[in-house]
């Protein structure tokens, strides 16, 4: 049973709709058909009884009672409403008169039928019916066709019993009128028989119509399924919001979910890219130190602190970026601690001197010890590390660092004697993946990360020309008042 349910119950919506609707139509059709058949049967019986009762009244009117005998004289031009066979009984059930002497018919009249007015039926065979229809050639032809199709077919004759009370001219009589044409040969009965075929044809016609209705009704769901497949194949980014009213809420929620997932994916991808870029400097220092150890230019005792410092920085950077990934987009600063700027820059300069040792970069700094940075230390190190690394990469020999501080802003200036940045590219270098010099190795990430961090401090980075002949980067950190609260 469970196996059957697993294989057959999870049907498609179209099949479910079709089966459910077909079931409803079938039940309603059968119900209406049964009601129609019962109604027709009752109406048919009433109509037949009324006609036979009319024949009975006619014979009662034409009957004469003389010398304790009854006689019936039928006019020659009398037009009977229907071919019938009439029998007249007295109150004791004795047969007084019969229109024709047909023994099997007389025996078929049950004594209990004669006790009350009523409507009955006599079941017989084709041969017996043929004796009743001896004078009706049209009915005989129809009966012949029935005999050819089924020699054992049963015929049903309607019987009406009417009791007439005694009067001055007539004793109590019971008149039995038998319809000589069986129900099976009547046109009305054939209509009844055809009703079943009409019902079956109706169902066969309804099923394809229901299929078309199901196909048309479920087209929006098919379209939605197709769009989902296109999403899986990366052929579309969002679901079409122009859909039916019932699916609008679902599509809107799915689009919101897709947007959230895409933003989260982009956030972590960006964070991973930024982390990879930030680890380049400490890894380069480790590589330079190991090279010095291999060439015996540095002793183990001197190399160990340098390597431990860079390993510690790598660990800090990983923790910092994981935390930053969870806070990205919130607009809330990680901390508002006070950090002297000069020591932080000294550590960066020391690391960069090791990275660019072969190039022989000369980095000079002119910063007052009182100048401080308010915020997360790793934010400052990340921004200035990227800006200084760019300056060292593109300078010829000299890099100069200076700073000034106002009530709410910290300005740090980094200048080099390199080729500088063309005016047309000064805004592009802060976009991810964009670089002013595409001939040198790089990813175009450092300055983009620096700008994103400074914007969190309501600051900016401004590129201009330096008096040294190269580029001048002005890094501005806002929100530098120690007592300032986040809005």
UniProtKB/Swiss-Prot annotation:
Domain of life (superkingdom): Bacteria
Subcellular location, principal: membrane
Cofactors (names): Ca(2+); Mg(2+)
Endoplasmic reticulum listed as a keyword: no
Keywords from the UniProt entry: ATP-binding, Cell inner membrane, Cell membrane, Growth regulation, Hydrolase, Kinase, Magnesium, Membrane, Metal-binding, Nucleotide-binding, Phosphoprotein, Protein phosphatase, Transferase, Transmembrane, Transmembrane helix, Two-component regulatory system, Virulence
Effect on the protein upon substituting residue 184 to K: Impaired PhoP repression by high concentrations of divalent cations
Regulation of this protein's activity per its record: Autokinase and kinase activities depend on low (uM range) Mg(2+) concentrations. Phosphatase activity is stimulated by high (mM range) Mg(2+) concentrations and ADP at 1 mM. Autokinase inhibited by radicicol.
InterPro entries: HAMP_dom, HATPase_C_sf, His_kinase_dom, HisK_dim/P_sf, PhoQ_Sensor, PhoQ_Sensor_sf, Sig_transdc_His_kin-like_C, TCS_sensor_his_kinase
Cytoplasmic topological segments: 1-16, 215-487
Annotated binding of a divalent metal cation, by residue: 151-152
Binding of Mg(2+), residues: 386, 443
BP GO annotations: phosphorelay signal transduction system
Residues found modified as Phosphohistidine: 277
Intervals, Periplasmic compartment: 38-193
Cofactor binding, note field: Binds up to 3 divalent cations (Ca(2+) or Mg(2+)); increasing concentrations of divalent cations allows better binding to phospholipids.
Catalytic activity: ATP + protein L-histidine = ADP + protein N-phospho-L-histidine
Conditions for induction: The phoP/phoQ operon is positively autoregulated by both PhoP and PhoQ in a Mg(2+)-dependent manner. Repressed by RcsB via sigma factor RpoS.
PROSITE patterns recorded: HAMP, HIS_KIN
Positions that bind ATP: 386-394, 416-421, 435-447
One MF term in the entry's GO annotations: metal ion binding
Domain spans labelled HAMP: 215-266
Subcellular location, record wording: Cell inner membrane
Subunit structure: Homodimer; probably dimerizes via the cytoplasmic domain. Interacts with MgrB in the periplasm, altering its activity and that of downstream effector PhoP.
Miscellaneous notes: Substitutions experiments show that amino acid Thr-48 may be involved in the conformational changes responsible for the balance between kinase-dominant state and phosphatase-dominant state.
Protein name, per record: Virulence sensor histidine kinase PhoQ
Source organism of the structure: Salmonella typhimurium (strain LT2 / SGSC1412 / ATCC 700720)
């Amino acid at each position: 049973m469970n196996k059957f349910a697993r294989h057959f119950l999870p049907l498609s919506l179209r099949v479910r709709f079709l089966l459910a609707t077909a079931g409803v139509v079938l039940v309603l059709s059968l119900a209406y058909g049964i009601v129609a058949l019962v109604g027709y049967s009752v109406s048919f019986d009433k109509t037949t009884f009324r006609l036979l009762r009319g024949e009975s009244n006619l014979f009662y009117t034409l009957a004469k009672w003389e010398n304790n005998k009854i006689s019936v004289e039928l006019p020659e031009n009398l037009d009977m409403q229907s071919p019938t066979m009439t029998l007249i009984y007295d109150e004791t059930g004795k047969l007084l008169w019969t229109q024709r002497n047909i023994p099997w018919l007389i025996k078929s009249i049950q004594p209990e039928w004669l006790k009350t007015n009523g409507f009955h039926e006599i079941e017989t065979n084709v041969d017996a019916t043929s004796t009743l229809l001896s004078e009706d050639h049209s009915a005989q032809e129809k009966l012949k066709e029935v005999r050819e199709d089924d020699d054992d077919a049963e015929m049903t004759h309607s019987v009406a019993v009417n009791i007439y009370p005694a009067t001055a001219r007539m004793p109590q009589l019971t008149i039995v009128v038998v319809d000589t044409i069986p129900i099976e040969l009547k046109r009305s009965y054939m209509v009844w028989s055809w009703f079943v075929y009409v019902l079956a044809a109706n169902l066969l016609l309804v099923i394809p119509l229901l299929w078309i209705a199901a196909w048309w009704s479920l087209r929006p769901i098919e379209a939605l399924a197709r769009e989902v497949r296109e999403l899986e194949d990366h052929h579309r980014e969002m679901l079409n919001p122009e859909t039916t009213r019932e699916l609008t809420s679902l599509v809107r929620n799915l689009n919101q979910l897709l947007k959230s997932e895409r933003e989260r994916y982009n956030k972590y991808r960006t964070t991973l890219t930024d982390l990879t870029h930030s680890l380049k400097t400490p890894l380069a220092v480790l590589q330079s130190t190991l090279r010095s150890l291999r060439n015996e230019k540095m002793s183990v005792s001197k190399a160990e602190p340098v390597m431990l410092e860079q390993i510690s920085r790598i660990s800090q950077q990983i923790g910092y970026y994981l935390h930053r990934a969870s806070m990205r987009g919130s607009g809330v600063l990680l901390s508002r601690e006070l950090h002297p700027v000069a020591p932080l820059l000294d550590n960066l300069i020391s690391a960069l001197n090791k990275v660019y040792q072969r190039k022989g970069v000369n980095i000079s700094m002119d910063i007052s010890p009182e100048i401080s940075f308010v915020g997360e230390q790793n934010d400052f190190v990340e921004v200035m590390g990227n800006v200084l690394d760019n300056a060292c990469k593109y300078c010829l020999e000299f890099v100069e660092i200076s700073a000034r501080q106002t009530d709410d802003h910290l300005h740090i200036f980094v200048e080099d004697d390199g080729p500088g940045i063309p005016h047309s590219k000064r805004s592009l270098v802060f976009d991810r993946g964009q670089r002013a010099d595409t001939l040198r190795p790089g990813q175009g990430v450092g300055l983009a990360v620096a700008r994103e961090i400074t914007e969190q401090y309501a600051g900016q980075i401004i590129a201009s020309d330096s008096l040294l002949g190269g580029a001048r980067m002005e890094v501005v950190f806002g929100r530098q008042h120690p007592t300032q609260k986040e809005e």
